[in-house]
Amino acid sequence: MKFTVHVKPNSRKKAVEMCEDGSLRVYLSAPPIEGRANEQLIEVLATHFGKAKREISIVAGRKRKMKIVEIV
């Protein structure tokens, strides 16, 4: 399944929220430098959905705050 994800890097909390339109808003403590926020995004989503990190991939938006993420 694919999700549109709105990433909020440099947040005080790490959390996942479901938006009304079916997308996810994910708060990350990592900065958007050298892929750190992307790595933490995969970790947070893996924990949230109970999946392994290898089952989650960023399909589009690696360098943007709005991403499309696929979960196998």
Sequence positions of predicted segments:
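Contiguous, often N-terminal, cationic amphipathic patches that form binding interfaces
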Residues: M1-G35, E39-I42, K51-K53, S57-V72
